[in-house]
Amino acid sequence: VGKMLKLPLTDREIPVIADEYVDKEFGTGCVKITPAHDPNDFEVGKRHNLEEICIMNDDATISVPGKYQGMDRYEARKAMVEDLKEMGLLVKVVPHSHNVGTHDRCGTTVEPMVKPQWFVKMEEMAKPAVEALKSGRLKFVPESFGKTYLHWLEGIRDWCISRQLWWGHRIPAYYCDDCGEMTVAKNAPAVCPKCGGTHLHQDEDTLDTWFSSALWPFSTLGWPKDTPEYEYFYPTDVLVTGYDIIFFWVIRMVFSGLEQTGKEPFHTVLIHGLVRDSQGRKMSKSLGNGIDPLEVIDKYGADALRMTLMTGNAPGNDMRFYWERVEASRNFANKVWNASRFIMMNIEKAPVTDVKLSGLQMADRWILSKVNTLAKDVTENMDKYELGIALQKVYDFIWEEFCDWYIEMVKPRLWSEEDTTKAAALWTLKTVLIQSLKLLHPYMPFITEEIFCNLQDEEPSIMISSWPVYKDEWNFAEEEKAVETIKDAVRAIRGVRTSMNVPPSKKAKVYVVSEDPEVLSIFEHSRVFFATLGYASDVILQKDKSGIADDAVSAVTAKATIYMPFAE
């Protein structure tokens, strides 16, 4: 260590140094470094004050004078090996496995080079961004991603903002060809401020795309002017983004916003995962597993795609893309559309009139109470950024409670000649559908807007309508319990019929036995829709089993025992 060696191919002397970067277990434990062509070697060179000698041109040909000048890098490497062999200096050639950087599209080997670049000094700019998170003014959802944010900021280096690309925002720096003076200006100067020369050219580099992206929250609003848009929209509330660009985008927006405006650009960062293919692989052009969202939209609709991306999606977690899930979302959209069309067809026959809550039947109050609770649950989960859970609750309510149960319950009333009960059913159907559409709208905006505008005339668009809120007067706990009792009995009857292979078209007499008079009263008040849902020719309520055939098939629920005579 400390001695000088002579490079046989150039006759130039280089020093022998010792550094902890060298892996003593790899190869001989000795390695020649190139500070101008490797990022790790560059750091070693800085520590030991080594000269940075660039030997390549931008087209990857050799630039240093001598035999190899102008040769392609691959050819030059082969020629150097042959020359060392002829000089008797080549001991052996041993293949080693190591990481080689390649272009992500064409696979060409990337050759690192030292180039003059533009940098932003980050040490002082990072401190306010760190303090913003630690003080609570900025938060991450999930909270664990705040550690990623701090990890990058607390170990941040100066930011290289220049890129050698053909497109992008040009760096506003101008050079005088006469004296070499550099000028940074908003507009291109006509003359050099130093020598008065008129021969100037702009820096050929472009800005890092994340530099302009970091300014996006306020630069799009007229900043640095205090425009109405800037005053209203900045800072915003929530940024939704992927965990893979916390460093590239989120951090840079935060420190840029604080530096330029004195304010964090948002108070919450909601992190989502990546959409991967069905095998769990990241979608990429090189793998050819990418899916064009426009193709999905053409086949299934934008709403189905939006719902698919939100279903079962927890903040920060990756999701796998399955076509079956898109089909399921499309089927749900069809379910909503068909149910809405059924309701609107009945409304056309008998326009909806206002109905007092006291005029509603048990099933009406039940579904009104359920959608009331749904509004509360969905809002609470959205406030916690549990968007997937909120969507699942809306899905379950619309598909099961509203479509499969309530609409089927009220069909006999819609066909009834009795105006009062029909009016209550129509008012409830319309009211609950509107509430459901509003809760579904963030996930399926197009179909909900279309249905909403055709369903009512009071509001021009669902987008500017009021968000559903919990109402105490819509809380009907007793009716909820009562209808659950009926639903349990219906499930029991259907289970018996399925086990006996009785088709829905064949009606059968049903006995409901309970010693509790309140339970029998529930069935008495819901006899019609209970018979409809249970495919019963008659519903008989009694306190005991007397008169029921011994061979009757039975099913026990929490509140009653259901019998269906075998002969029936």
PLM region spans:
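NTP-handling and nucleic-acid-processing catalytic cores
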Residues: 1-59, 128-162, 191-196, 219-234, ...
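Residue patterns forming the tRNA-binding/recognition surfaces of aminoacyl-tRNA synthetases
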Residues: 2-4, 12, 21-177, 249, ...
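Active-site palm subdomain of RNA-directed nucleic acid polymerases
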Residues: 46, 52, 257-263
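Short microdomains enriched in Cys/His and/or Lys/Arg
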Residues: 110-117, 124-133, 197-222
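Feature 926 captures the class I aminoacyl-tRNA synthetase adenylation module centered on the KMSKS loop
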Residues: 151-211, 215, 259-302, 317, ...
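A short glycine/serine-rich beta->alpha loop
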Residues: 233-244
